[in-house]
Amino acid sequence: MSRCPVKGFLFEMVKTSSNVLFTQLKRAAIVALCLFVFCEWLIYYLVIYQCSWPELHSEGREGRFDPLRIMLLTDTHLLGPKHGHWFDKLRREWQMERAFQTAVAHFKPDVVFLLGDLFDEGLYSNDEEWDFYVQRFHKMFDHSENTEFHVVVGNHDIGFHPEAARDSHLFERFSSVFDSPSVKLINIKRNIFVLVNSIALQGDDCSMCSEAMSQLHAVADKLNCYRRSKKEIFEDIVKQDRTFCELPKDSPPPILIQHFPLYRETEMSCTGVDAPPPDLKQITNREKWEVVSKEMSNTLLTLIRPRLVLSGHTHHGCYLVHEDGTPEMTIPSFSWRNRNNPSFVLSVITPERYALSKCFIPRESTVIAVYIIAGLAFVLVNFRPTYRYLKTRRTCRQITLDCCVR
């Protein structure tokens, strides 16, 4: 039997082509790994490091106060066991964890405030599911002991008023885990914060609402102690309700933090890249659902007399000034699940002044676009070598067949 004269040559061609294909596959694996690292880790540093603490312009005696640096975020909506696809849960929670950990490591805030709707299914979770929920939350939003962490409750954590009033256990377990009563007064570096449970501001006789109003008036008494007459203070001393004013006489007006925004008829006054779209701006807000009722909003402004109001709930950004001159910033959602361009707020505060700045985290559309563009570019660059390998294999197979036939 005669030997095929091109057998050795064909073998070398196939071997060379195989090496080329192996090299391409190895290169593809390296590119895929680098792309994954960039989109899932490095991009957060690249975007968040472009943000910075706002500059607090000093006036007069401003330098005598040590500025307080706070970070604010809201509406994280961790998915629960009943709703949402597992990949959706994995993707969006990884995004929030990376964004939060990157921001906290870089900015090192003194305090972090999360303005409600920590969970998406708090209302529907039994105690076992709730415990697992809380463990996931603490893992995602882990922070150093040098950073204080405070939260307020949202409607997805315990339900709107009808559900929360019907089952008091929902708010009780949230309050016990996060040390978050319906009304809480915090004094940090002489800056006063009042944290309020918006769900309890219904003005009815439910136990949660009654307790909230009692706590609200107690906090208002502390805030307005020095505004009261000497006769009123003396009467309290006699009753042993109070022996002295707890806050310093020169304490600044507080900052009010809650989940629901104060009453506003629509979102027409909201501006910015994260403001509601035009079709949503015109919709009338429902009291006790989208915003605090008009009556209770006036009560809060009268009792607390805040210098600033911070809220969440709408998933959109908004800054406005109420009729009495009180400014309010509504912070957008921190989750890709609620918007394409999530953000958080950095604030520098002293008893006399404050400054706010908004920091955006990577857009979900940007990350997806990077994956698609990089993938297509790699395929196009490597298409010709791969095509040549496949063509060589086909040619060699045909030549070998012809040689053997002869």
Predicted regions and their residues:
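Binuclear metal-dependent phosphoesterase catalytic core
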Residues: S2-C4, F9-F11, L21-A28, A32-H57, ...
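N-terminal active-site segment of His-dependent metallophosphoesterases
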Residues: S2-D131, R136
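Loop/turn elements at helix/coil->beta-strand transitions in domains of secreted/extracellular proteins
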Residues: E40, D66-L68, K108-D110, S144-F149, ...
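Extended active-site neighborhood of metal-dependent phosphoesterases/phosphodiesterases
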Residues: Q50-G60, L123-K249, D279-T284, T302, ...
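Active-site-proximal beta-strand elements of phosphoester/diester hydrolases
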Residues: P67-H83, R190-D204, P254-H259, L308, ...
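Active-site neighborhood of phospho(di)ester-bond hydrolases with catalytic His/Asp-centered motifs
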Residues: L72-T74, V112-D117, E148-N155, V196-N197, ...
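Solvent-exposed loop/turn segments at secondary-structure junctions
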Residues: T76-L79, L118-E121, N155-G159, I199-G203, ...
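Short acidic, glycine-rich surface-loop motifs adjacent to enzyme active sites
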Residues: K249-E267
